[in-house]
């Protein structure tokens, strides 16, 4: 029997809550869940008792690491909320969430305004065309300033922020807000956790300013909306409903970003924020169709939210759940899916059975019989599905746009403390890498060491912590290693010839390959330019494979060789002795022979480092950047502090948090994200080669 949809599509909202670390994002989500009736007791991040942060390390560190998906209800709407981490090491979690959201709430700290990590998540949201509203939080905090925060959106994000409210008071005088659309004031009751307020006339001393801002707001809307512009120019009255509808249209087109004020911790402004989510953020019907391709014809297909269409969903997160084991979060783009039915994982071309479907409430779950288009839910029973896989109706296979994940930039060796821990560690690493595509675990074939790599020191700390807590694995950790790469800088043509005659069947493979440097980031490209069968067809894939295997261990110091074009253009073969294996070896010999003439270099990851310090420490900090082979890319004033933008090699950034803390007496902060790879200076390259026992190259 078919189940019926509880909430129509137009009354569904899939939203993310994004922010800089410490802007109060998790507390805001908590309050939303509290007021929508999902939580009976409020947990403070300060006490480590928050509903959304359900992993132990998140509660200890007071930061959100994994995006828990939670369902809430507000004024007849279903709101699926994805809580996203605000720490730079977890930007992949943010991207992963943005892929499946329709709209987002950006939370700012009312004292700091737009901070470096806000810029990162804002840029990511813009890449995915996600409409946003902004909540200026912590208005009760010392130094909070609503107008400063709104201006920081214009200046630092170049975004058209539209304040729909004015704050009544600030810091410990923050009493409520003026609604510039309704032209009313909401003043909070001091005694009952802010869950009740009085709707009153705008305070006399704010009336004139409120009217001025109301006018300015209508002008801003008219600038981006023709209907309002027409009425405005004709001098006709614009009703509140018309104004709201126009703000919604402009928000969905990313022409405007409505801004609201409040203090989640003091329970002020959260209900108005919820109203804004319903009024201004998109339903699955409002967003542009989702791109997919037909795996047989490569024809582009556009998916719309429609329950009658064939089922198509994206697995956007795999988690090991303490209660139900392996849990796959899915976003349904079209069609419906009943628990117990089969789906096709079209990415891996495997049929899978969905055992149970769960609606997630941060740490408690409700079993549901069916999911519909536009829904976000958890599925149990998908054994082969990993993050970014497409799940479709077995009779209508589709490939949804897959996710791109950055390569890890930092690596450490881990070894189990006891033999008994070895198997447990392998299981733990396998599960953790299934959950997180930017975390990789591998064994060094030469040393037998287990190496884990990730996006930063905090990222790996948390992985190691989870091994200990969730999988009870005790491990020793080595010093962090940088994920260097190798590349060619010159074009060269070389021969690789492998001949072995030792009685019986011999081995014979002979190739001529032209190697050319590829654009940075373009990776490896292989071209078959063989004419006249000088290398038989069946051996050409072996040449390609042989090159890729040899490139994995580089030519200078054992790091992967990247960004190279290889053109196989000549060679020879032996009727009896040639084999796939012989041509694989010949290809790897060609790569080795290219070292002398292709100008190989070692590339190192360069990080974008933004350092915020009080002015009096500026000179010292800039000296530190230069001493670490960094380049200062500019500075800007932030209140009485300075933001230094710089690019620094990752190898020079280990332990920098401690250095900065002592150099600025604990007042400096920095964020660091991977930016690009570039060649190391000659002296550094020589050191790396020596340390790794590699082969120095003669100039």
From Swiss-Prot:
Question: Would I find GTP-binding among this entry's keywords?
Answer: yes
Tell me the Pfam families matching this sequence: EF-G_D2 (PF22042), EFG_C (PF00679), EFG_III (PF14492), EFG_IV (PF03764), GTP_EFTU (PF00009)
Gene Ontology molecular function: GTP binding; GTPase activity; translation elongation factor activity
Database matches in InterPro entries: EF-G-like_DII, EFG_II, EFG_III, EFG_III/V, EFG_IV, EFG_V, EFG_V-like, G_TR_CS
Q: Know the name of this protein?
A: Elongation factor G
Question: Is the Protein biosynthesis keyword given for this protein?
Answer: yes
Which SMART domains does the entry link to? EFG_C, EFG_IV
Q: Give the gene symbol.
A: fusA
For this chain, the family text in UniProt reads: Belongs to the TRAFAC class translation factor GTPase superfamily. Classic translation factor GTPase family. EF-G/EF-2 subfamily.
Keywords (alphabetical) are: Cytoplasm, Elongation factor, GTP-binding, Nucleotide-binding, Protein biosynthesis
Q: Name one GO cellular component term.
A: cytoplasm
Residues bound to GTP are 19-26, 83-87, 137-140
Record GO biological process: ribosome disassembly
Cellular location of this protein?
Answer: Cytoplasm
Organism ancestry: Bacteria, Bacillati, Bacillota, Bacilli, Lactobacillales
Which Gene3D superfamilies does the record match to this protein? 3.30.230.10, 3.30.70.240, Elongation Factor G (Translational Gtpase), domain 3, P-loop containing nucleotide triphosphate hydrolases, Translation factors
Q: Which residues form the tr-type G domain?
A: 10-285
Role, per record: Catalyzes the GTP-dependent ribosomal translocation step during translation elongation. During this step, the ribosome changes from the pre-translocational (PRE) to the post-translocational (POST) state as the newly formed A-site-bound peptidyl-tRNA and P-site-bound deacylated tRNA move to the P and E sites, respectively. Catalyzes the coordinated movement of the two tRNA molecules, the mRNA and conformational changes in the ribosome.
For this protein, the record's SUPFAM superfamilies field holds:
EF-G C-terminal domain-like, P-loop containing nucleoside triphosphate hydrolases, Ribosomal protein S5 domain 2-like, Translation proteins
